[in-house]
């Protein structure tokens, strides 16, 4: 189930790397919660008076994650009435300025708000060095900034029930796409619990993901849970040529967000040269991945009206939308399952 709010105006293929430290207890407790998704900006290369640079904000269970932070990202957040201070993680797809140059200002704003909680940054190899360079103008902060560089041997990582999957894409610098996945445990099966002689007094606690012990016997959540149900998934990838990694990681997504740098068919040669995607190529990926909805983003500054290409693009994938700054969606678990 989802609810979409769309303001009319405003603002090398590689190995899959899975970042996952979600505990079974967290998975067992994820019920009835909402994932807020907001595409803060939709521009590529440079901010424009009517279009901020591409950035994605997601909020779930009281936590916030931001993907990319170009120039003006915190202004786009303010326009939505959101504060940068609650951000817990910032992920970077790559280190071109339109995706990371807004970080120093964001850090200073957080510091001025007297933030004390650590901030986690995730990005390609070299992140620590890049952040150190940017922090020359933000050296004194009242909170710790931690960096995790994605490598082929990345260690599992968890964040309040999110599972993050980073996958290599094909740009002219090292670049990754991201999927955010929220797993959902199965329903509590009373008959199964009774068959295994689980005391009824433990049922509610097992549903919350607790592991319990009584008289030397251990009771775990999976002993009373049915098959895992469909959770939620959002996939985001920009600044890349079409790759098999994007297709594979997009499967099962409730919302797919891909770059549509160019809408004109004759810009395909330019897209290939600069390692970007056309709207038509993005639509083809969405079709092959069988997702329910595609939002296009990261438009060329020369493209003032991306929506004018939708009639032709939808011939490939009907559920394609030329996203605008500030588009939001609320994703919920299907309570019918």
List each language-model region with its residue ranges.
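Residue-identity detector for glycine
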Residues: 9-10, 14, 29-32
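Metal-dependent phosphodiesterase/nuclease catalytic metal-binding core
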Residues: 27-29, 153-296, 305-316, 332-337
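Conserved beta-strand hairpin/beta-sheet module of binuclear metal-dependent hydrolase folds
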Residues: 27-80, 118, 178-180, 226-237, ...
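Active-site neighborhood of phospho(di)ester-bond hydrolases with catalytic His/Asp-centered motifs
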Residues: 67-70, 87-95, 123-124, 235-240, ...
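Active-site metal-binding motif and surrounding structural segment of the metallo-beta-lactamase
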Residues: 71-122, 144-154
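Metal-dependent catalytic neighborhoods of phosphoester/phosphodiester hydrolases
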Residues: 102-110, 131-134, 304-312
